[in-house]
Amino acid sequence: HSVRPEKYSEINNFYTATVYEKGAEIIRMLSLIIGEKDYYKSVQIFFDRHDGEAITVEDWIKVFEDSTGKDLKQFFLWYTQSGTTELEVSMVFDPQNNELELNIKQFNPPTSDAKKKKPLPILLQLGLLDYDGKEYLLKRNNSNEESEYSSLLKMEVREQSYIFTDINNAPVPSLLRG
C-alpha cells in the first residue's frame, strides 16, 4: 500500500517498517527537489504555522508549495500511490561526437487498488566512470550547470533521455549514488 493509503482494513498494517522507511526517503527526496536552503526555510515556516497541531500530509506539502512557489501535486503521488516503481536504464555511446545518451523508463505496475498508475517524480544521482574507475566530469547537453563528477537527474515523466558531452570512451554508469 501507499505511505498514506486512502483506506485500510487493519490499522496494524498501516504502521510498518516499510511505511516509515519509505516516508523518510520521501522527505529526503523533497529536500533535494526543493533545495537545502528552501527546505530548512519551509520546515521553519511549517513549525511556525502548525506547532502543537495535529496535521496532515496535505498541510506538510502545502507549506512547501507556499514557501517555494513550486507545484508539488506530482510529488504528492509518493504519499498516495501504491506499488513499487521499476526503472529500466539503457545507454547509447556515440564515439564520433563524444556523447552519451542515457535513457530511463519508469514502470509502475498495476496493484489491486489501481490498474493505471501515474509516473512519479524520481531523482537519480549519477556518475560515469571509465574502465579504470576514473570519474568523468559530467556536462549535460543544453545545460548551464557546471561540470561535476556527479549529476542529479530529475525525472518527471514515464520516459526521459539525458545527453552527456565530452565523454571520450564508453563509460560505466554509477547510478543511485547516496
Where are these regions (language model features)?
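Non-catalytic accessory/interaction domains
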Residues: 3-6, 18, 23-26, 37-40, ...
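Glycine- and acidic
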Residues: 8-13, 43-46
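Acidic, glycine-rich low-complexity/disordered segments
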Residues: 31-36
